[in-house]
């Protein structure tokens, strides 16, 4: 198993960890009600997905 030869400094550790960022979710406008919603998920305000009513709202 690979083992670090030297202790990594706090600065280097934090610099490496700073690259791990949460991705910003992509919002699109709903085709029916034009409210912002997540892609590939039913619209929470009108309940449609792919031009079909899938949720009772």
From Swiss-Prot:
GO biological process: translation
Gene Ontology CC terms, in alphabetical order: large ribosomal subunit
Keyword Ribonucleoprotein on entry: yes
Record GO terms (molecular function): structural constituent of ribosome
Keywords for the protein's UniProt record, in alphabetical order: Ribonucleoprotein, Ribosomal protein
InterPro entries the record matches: Ribosomal_bL32 (IPR002677), Ribosomal_bL32_bact (IPR044957), Ribosomal_zn-bd (IPR011332)
Family the UniProt entry places it in: Belongs to the bacterial ribosomal protein bL32 family.
Protein name, per record: Large ribosomal subunit protein bL32
Organism: Streptomyces avermitilis (strain ATCC 31267 / DSM 46492 / JCM 5070 / NBRC 14893 / NCIMB 12804 / NRRL 8165 / MA-4680)
Gene: rpmF
């Amino acid at each position: 198993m690979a083992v670090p030869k030297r202790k990594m400094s706090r600065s280097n550790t934090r610099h490496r960890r700073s690259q791990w960022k949460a991705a910003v979710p992509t919002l699109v406008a709903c085709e029916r009600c034009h409210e912002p919603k997540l892609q590939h998920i039913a619209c929470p305000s009108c309940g449609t997905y792919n031009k079909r009513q899938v949720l009772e709202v």
